[in-house]
Each structure stands twice: as structure tokens, then as C-alpha cells.
Regions:
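Structural motif
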Residues: 47-55, 177-181
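A short, flexible beta-alpha/helix-coil linker loop
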Residues: 9-13, 128-137, 173-176
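Active-site loop/turn elements of alpha/beta-hydrolase fold enzymes
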Residues: 8, 44-46, 69
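N-terminal beta1-alpha1 ligand-phosphate binding loop
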Residues: 1-35
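A short beta-strand-loop structural module common to alpha/beta enzyme folds
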Residues: 35-48, 169-172
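A structural motif corresponding to the C-terminal end of an alpha-helix
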Residues: 31-37, 113, 119, 157-166
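Helix-loop-strand module that forms the ligand-binding subsite of alpha/beta enzymes
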Residues: 51-154
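Glycine-rich phosphate/pyrophosphate-binding loop and the adjoining helix
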Residues: 1-4, 20-21, 26, 140-181
Length: 181
């Protein structure tokens, strides 16, 4: 299996250095590599070439987003990454041709024009929120929503181009817990 890891952590000096996200990406690379999988990684903060990233998405069977969650979403550099990579994939018609709808077939639904069927997308995220804040109807902030509900703005991009979105993985309460292992 070919796996592409997109490490979207953004460093905030003296507050959020990315140690945990980088360690998680390294652990994933080592674990998958030891089992014979071909693994590539892009550290978005360091730089990326949209055309290279389109090729990596085409080549990968699974794309893993490793990210911190800041203010209930991925860091802004990830939005830039998606804009540049997916627009390059649309322009070249490699990731998708269109949004799926056609005038000749009104039954075609919005979000069905992608070419990435048979591929998976997985989010591994670090959260300051405690795990019991999710799927909890008594939680005032999230009101019973799951982690995946809150990550819909991220996963929908991949579903739009045809990926199967897998259930996410999270490490929670990272500032409130001294041991996140």
C-alpha cells in the first residue's frame, strides 16, 4: 500500500512547537514502513509544490492528514495547501473534472465528479479538548457532535474528489494531560 502523510502542524513558538504531531507522523512512517508500505510525507510548513502533491495524491492508496486542531480547525496553512493542491488537480483534471452534476443527467449529484474512488482519507489530530467533550449531548460547546462531525470541513474536500473518508483518530486534552502516550 502507498501512503502519503500530510503534516499540517503550524509552529507557534513557545506555545505549540509541533513535537507531538511530528512524533505521530514519524511513528506512522516507521510503523507503515516496517510493514512494507511505501510512505511519503509532506510537511506543509516547510514547503510544497502543488503539482508534486497532486502526483502524490494520485499515487497514494491512503492519504493521512496529521494535524493539530487550532480554533476548531486545521491550521491556516492547511487551507492554503488544499486550495493550491486541489485547484491544481482540478485544472489538470487529475483529481476531478467537475462537481459531478450534468445537464444531460439530472440524477448526478453534487460532489460526485472526482477521480479518487478506491482511495482512503484519514485524519489523525491532536486536540486540547478532552475526549469526553465529544459525542456528549450534555456538552455545552459541541452539543453531542462527534469529532468527525467537527472535521467535516476538512473531510468533505476529500469526499468531494472521490475518497472514502475513514473514521478519524485523536489524541485529546494535550495541554491538560501530562502523559499523552
Amino acid at each position: 500500500m502507498r501512503v502519503h502523510i500530510v503534516n499540517a502542524h503550524l509552529t507557534y513558538p513557545n506555545w505549540s512547537e509541533g513535537t507531538l504531531n511530528h512524533a505521530m507522523a514519524e511513528k506512522a512512517k516507521a510503523h507503515l514502513g516496517a510493514r512494507g508500505h511505501d510512505v511519503t510525507e509532506t510537511v506543509v510548513e516547510e514547503s510544497f509544490d502543488p503539482e508534486v502533491e497532486v502526483r502524490r495524491h494520485l499515487d497514494a492508496d491512503l492519504v493521512v492528514l496529521q494535524t493539530s486542531i487550532n480554533w476548531f480547525g486545521a491550521p491556516w496553512i492547511y487551507k492554503r495547501y488544499i486550495d493550491e493542491v486541489f485547484n491544481a488537480g482540478l485544472k489538470s483534471k487529475k483529481l476531478l473534472d467537475n462537481d459531478g452534476r450534468t445537464r444531460s443527467d439530472p440524477t448526478r449529484q453534487y460532489g460526485t465528479g472526482g477521480h479518487m474512488q478506491g482511495k482512503g482519507f484519514f485524519i489523525a489530530a491532536t486536540w486540547n479538548a478532552p475526549a469526553d467533550a465529544f459525542d456528549n449531548p450534555d456538552n455545552t460547546l459541541f452539543e453531542g457532535r462527534s469529532v468527525d462531525d467537527l472535521l467535516l470541513n476538512i473531510s468533505s474536500n476529500y469526499k468531494f474528489v472521490g475518497y472514502t473518508v475513514l473514521r478519524s483518530y485523536g489524541i485529546y486534552d494535550i495541554f491538560g494531560t501530562t502523559d499523552v502516550a
